[in-house]
Amino acid sequence: MEGLGEMKPEMMYGSPWYEEYTRIAPHPEDFDKLFAKKTQMDKQIKDLPAEAIRSIKGPTLLIIGDSDLVRPEHAVEMFRLLGGGVFGDTPAGLPNSQLAILPGSSHVTLVDRADWLVSMIDAFLEAPIKSE
């Protein structure tokens, strides 16, 4: 999440998040203060060791945008740690984990892709769980 350090509050001006905050907050002029606090909070998030991610046994659906703060390379790395990225045309079949990288999307604009998200999430939730 090294991209967090590059984020500035003015980068969010005009975004749906900014517009909603300034509409409902008791002190809309404090958006920059909120952003600074959120940035500090995000920097406190500890990286999970690869073994901790590898130990997740439940089906996992990773979704990012191709212009997301989360780099595609990082999402692919996570996907592989979760058992994905293997050749699925074998008797073993597809892994329980799935990765979706939505084109023309950012972390914020993913919410505008409900038509894509709903169909992907429904299919993921309906998929049979393969025993490991």
Q: For each of these PLM feature ranges, what is it?
A:
Residues 16-37:
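Short glycine/proline- and acidic residue-enriched helix-loop micro-motifs
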Residues 69-77, 110:
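Conserved alpha/beta-hydrolase "acid-adjacent" motif
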Residues 89-132:
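Catalytic active-site module of serine/aspartate enzymes centered on a nucleophile-bearing elbow/loop
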Residues 53-57, 92-94:
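Short, conserved loop/helix-junction motifs that constitute active-site signature segments
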Residues 1-21:
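Flexible "cap/lid" loop of the alpha/beta hydrolase fold
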Residues 36-52:
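Active-site nucleophile elbow and catalytic-triad environment of alpha/beta-hydrolase enzymes
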Residues 66-69, 104-106:
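Acidic beta-to-alpha connecting loop that harbors the catalytic carboxylate
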Residues 56, 62-64:
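Short beta-strand/loop motif that positions the catalytic acidic residue
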